[in-house]
């Protein structure tokens, strides 16, 4: 298993590189490693890693091609699911079923129900609520003193939105990010799996209680009730229900939260881009897409080959893990010129892969985009200047691009 220092990508033979080595995702060295792989070995085989052997797919074109063939490259939980990191499991250690970890045709029926909560009309209905809450949050922040943007802005805004989506008890909403962090925590997976399981069981018990309550009540427009009263999802067993709730909590929490946090990092690295946004508010929707591209809140998605297949001259065997590195495809020089830079008005920012591609494209993409757009818009309307007051701390996580802390000070607006 690789234990090389973070700068090893500069000297190691290409065959010895392990793109999943967790510290790279905390110190940023994952980006030059991926640049090297795109140039020298865009389809790369890692024989020895913490997560076993796997293939890496690193270019935008190759990722979309793999994504477009879901019956050859499977997402099924029974085959390993969508990540090389340990997935959520039940008490027997079996991976929890969730619709993201299903293949067609089963996947489409399950996804269709959840998608009802994210139609354009539903997003429009939520829009004013998002704007009011975002404005209030920004106006409540301390001025000229250091605070953690992740804690006071990113986490609070995404937690409130999740609670509204689920109609989760408002006075308990603080539990949602705690459960999300437990599901994804590399530290708990590696060092305290029982604590992780305990927290997941707590989540399961609370959502099962809500499931029982709403099963016996009239349907309401929240996502939880929609799932329970739908023909496609209403007959699912308890484990699948909890698996889907885990998916929606992590998806709704981590993608948006980490993009909101990463935006502050980006505009401090390139302050001219923030001034460009303030001067040209019409580019804000594009700037939100560029944020999602540059941050890459989901670093990879994993598939499993269902048959022997040749790809770009390489032979994949049935059962091989195939890892699509979104964090690499989002900076592919063939698609995104100067892709390591945040460029607020980048013309093709929406071609990012952070929401996936094909049948598994993120069902909540519109809502995530809206939340980020509103945050940028409300900051720009206040001519707000948010300056870093310390290092941005990232988690050593090869699946979710978790930003743990962004110490800042508001010096204007």
Describe every region a protein language model picked out:
Residues 1-413:
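Cytochrome P450
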């Amino acid at each position: 298993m690789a234990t090389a220092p973070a700068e090893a990508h500069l000297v190691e033979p290409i065959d010895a590189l392990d793109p999943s080595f967790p510290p790279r995702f905390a110190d940023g060295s994952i980006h030059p490693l991926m640049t090297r792989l795109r140039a020298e070995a865009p389809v790369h085989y890692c024989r020895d890693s913490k997560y076993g052997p796997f293939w890496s797919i690193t270019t935008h074109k190759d990722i979309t091609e793999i994504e477009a063939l879901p019956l050859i490259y499977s997402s099924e939980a029974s085959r390993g699911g969508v990540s090389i990191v340990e997935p959520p499991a039940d008490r027997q250690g079996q991976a929890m079923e969730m619709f993201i970890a299903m293949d067609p045709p089963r996947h489409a029926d399950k996804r269709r129900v959840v998608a009802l909560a994210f139609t354009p009309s539903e997003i429009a209905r939520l829009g004013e609520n998002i704007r009011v809450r975002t404005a209030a949050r920004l106006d409540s922040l301390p001025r000229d003193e250091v605070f953690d943007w992740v804690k006071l802005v990113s986490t609070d805004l995404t937690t409130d939105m999740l609670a509204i989506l689920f109609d989760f008890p408002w006075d308990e909403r603080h539990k949602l990010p705690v459960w999300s962090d437990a599901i994804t925590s590399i530290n708990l997976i590696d060092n305290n799996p029982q604590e992780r399981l305990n927290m997941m069981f707590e989540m399961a018990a609370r959502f099962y209680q809500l499931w029982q309550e709403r099963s016996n009540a009239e349907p309401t427009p929240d996502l939880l009730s929609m799932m329970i009263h739908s023909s496609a999802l209403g007959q699912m067993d308890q484990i699948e229900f909890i698996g889907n709730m885990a998916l929606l909590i992590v998806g709704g929490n981590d993608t948006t939260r980490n993009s909101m946090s990463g935006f502050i990092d980006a505009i401090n690295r390139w302050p001219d881009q923030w001034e460009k946004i303030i001067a040209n508010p019409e580019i804000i929707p594009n700037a939100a897409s560029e944020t999602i591209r540059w941050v890459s809140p989901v670093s990879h998605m994993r598939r499993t080959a269902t048959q022997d297949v040749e790809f770009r001259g390489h032979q994949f065997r049935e059962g091989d893990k195939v890892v699509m590195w979104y964090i690499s495809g989002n900076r592919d020089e063939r698609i995104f010129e100067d892709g390591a830079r945040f460029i607020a008005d980048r013309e093709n920012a929406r071609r990012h892969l952070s929401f996936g591609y094909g049948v598994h494209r993120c069902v909540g993409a519109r809502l995530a985009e809206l939340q980020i757009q509103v945050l940028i818009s409300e900051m720009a309307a206040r001519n707000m200047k948010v300056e870093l007051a310390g290092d941005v701390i990232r988690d050593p996580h090869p699946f979710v691009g978790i930003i743990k802390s962004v110490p800042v000070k508001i010096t204007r607006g």
